[in-house]
Regions:
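CoA-thioester-processing core
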Residues: 124, 128-130, 138, 144-177
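Glycine- (often His-adjacent) and acidic-residue-rich active-site loop
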Residues: 9, 15-18, 88-124, 143, ...
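Hydrophobic alpha-helical membrane-association signature
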Residues: 64-68, 117-120, 150
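Hydrophobic/aromatic residues within transmembrane alpha-helices
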Residues: 49, 86, 99, 150-151
Length: 177
């Protein structure tokens, strides 16, 4: 930051909601921004947010939804971050939606709990939409169901050659709204 020599650099307030954004199943990393020639741009970063549940095609659990919300908010607040890359671990899937194992074990038969979960999911979509930085969805493999919905909330998508996109809900009597 360039400040006149007689003026001190300003101390900025921390606007993050929590100090620790770490949640199981979500990885967050700041990577240095690079110029087209590959050289690093000093003091400028890209935030990388990974869904990390490759054994279940990066389907998101309740904790992962919370982690994405916190990570998007932190990236949005980080003055040194210029964009967000949102992706999934591995090459099989960006995300296949909600974790059906968690649905079956906890949410089945508990409509009030499921309503709270869906509210949290909507908050995740809102966090992506509200991010002050461009959000790039990096699609590796499948982007299905709720994964398609969160991917569409991003500013744009970049997909590998074998990426697959789809919506599972209509086959089961539901559709995104």
């Amino acid at each position: 930051m360039n400040a006149p020599e007689n003026l001190p650099l300003r101390d900025f307030k921390n606007h993050d909601l929590v100090d620790d954004i770490g949640k199981p199943g979500v990885r967050v990393e700041r990577r240095p921004a690079r110029r087209p020639d590959g050289s690093v741009v000093p003091g400028l970063y890209n935030a990388w947010i990974w869904l990390d549940n490759p054994g279940q095609y990066n389907s998101y659990t309740t904790d992962m939804v919370k982690g994405v919300i916190l990570a998007m908010r932190a990236a949005s607040n980080d003055r040194a971050v210029n964009c967000v890359v949102f992706t999934g671990v591995g090459d099989k899937a960006f995300c296949t939606g909600g974790n059906t194992k968690e649905y079956a074990e906890y949410y089945a038969g508990q409509p009030q709990e499921y309503r709270q979960y869906m509210r949290l999911f909507n908050d995740m979509v809102s966090a992506i939409l509200a991010c002050d930085k461009p959000v790039i969805c990096r699609v590796n493999g499948m982007r299905i169901g709720g994964g398609q919905e969160i991917g569409m909330a991003c500013d744009f998508s970049v997909a590998q050659d074998l990426a697959r996109f789809g919506q599972a809900g209509p086959k089961h009597g539901s559709a995104p709204i």
